[in-house]
Every structure is written in structure tokens, then in C-alpha cells.
């Protein structure tokens, strides 16, 4: 594993509607992440509260308004990139979408789906960090 050179904290949201949640297909110059399915979310800006960052990121990426985000927890993932290892902290929330009218930001994503938990877990081309986080923090809630 290359040495740890970068640490990043992001918010991600499991945005629910009608017993499904929203996933987006990423457009990225990094091949490891390009055309991988992911949850809406992104970087927290300076001075921003994580729940507000989630609202902003979801709106920027999808045009959706969401209800009050509920904190699921924090998950850590290490990305082994060719030149470094990036440690990413994912602050995970779930929230309800106020509508299903998704308008994608084409610079960030080129497709979306509303999926069940089982459908998401069966997708092979997803961001590993999202799948690990969902398995750790969200899936146990669905089985309770």
C-alpha cells in the first residue's frame, strides 16, 4: 500500500423515495471512479455543517430538495491510488426526497437509478466505499 498522503471528509446521502434510494453514475477523470455508481454527496465546504453540505450537494447534483437528514454514522475507506493512499471519512445520512424529478449535473453524473438495497448490493460497478458504508450502516437498519 502506498503511503498515506491525503485525507478527505465527505458527506453522502441515502436519499429515499417509495422504498428505494437514489444512486448516480459518476463522471470522473480518475479511471478508478469513472462510470461507477455512487450515492449523492461530496466535500464539505469551510464553515459548513455536514447536514447542510448534504442538502447543497444533493441539490447541485440532482436538483432535488430533501427532508431533514438523519445521521447514520461515519465510515472510513482507504483508496489505494497508484501514487498514494487516500483515507476518506464518509459522514453518512439518510433523508427523504421531496420529489422524484432528478435533473443531473452532467459534469458530475451521467445517469441515475432508484434502487432497493438488494439491487444496489448486486451492482458490480459501484464505488467500493459506498457499498461498504451501506453494508455497515444502512443494511442493518433495513433488517431490523
Predicted feature descriptions by range:
Residues 72-73:
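Local beta-strand/beta-hairpin segments that build beta-sheet-rich folds
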Residues 20-60:
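Conserved Nudix-box catalytic region and its N-terminal flanking loop in Nudix hydrolases
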Residues 36, 43, 81, 134-136:
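A generic membrane alpha-helix/interface feature
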Residues 1-22, 43, 90, 94:
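Conserved N-terminal beta-strand and adjoining loop/helix that marks the start
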Residues 14, 37, 113:
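Residues that recognize and position ribonucleotide moieties
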Residues 3-7, 33-36, 83-89, 106:
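A generic structural micro-feature
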Residues 129-144:
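Charged phosphate-binding loop/patch that engages nucleotide di/tri-phosphates or the phosphate backbone
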Residues 44-67, 77-129:
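Unchanged
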